[in-house]
A protein has these predicted regions:
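Ribonuclease/tRNase effector modules and their secretory precursors
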Residues: 1-83
Length: 83
């Protein structure tokens, strides 16, 4: 099972953690971002928060050098990631 950690900024828009995790695990699209810190890889995933959802989420995830997956951003998808 993949485990995620959440930063305070991930909670800014009130997206429940299980919804953000589901969107990442069942994403329909992703983009590689500039790393937030040295030694990290950062991604923005777009996916549904649950199978019956009509609106997509964008979820930012950083993977650090130890393999920890850290969700730092979660909100309804914006035009920047809507394709």
């Amino acid at each position: 099972m993949v485990r995620f950690e959440f930063t305070d900024s991930a909670d800014k828009h009130g997206i429940p953690h299980p919804d953000a995790e589901h969107a990442v695990m069942h994403h329909v699209e992703y983009e590689i971002l500039q790393p937030r810190r040295t030694g990290e890889q950062s991604f923005m995933f777009v996916g549904l928060p649950h199978p019956q959802a009509l609106r997509y989420l964008e979820v930012g995830v950083a993977v650090d050098g130890r393999g920890r997956r850290i969700i730092f951003h979660a909100m309804e998808v914006t035009d920047l990631y809507r394709h």
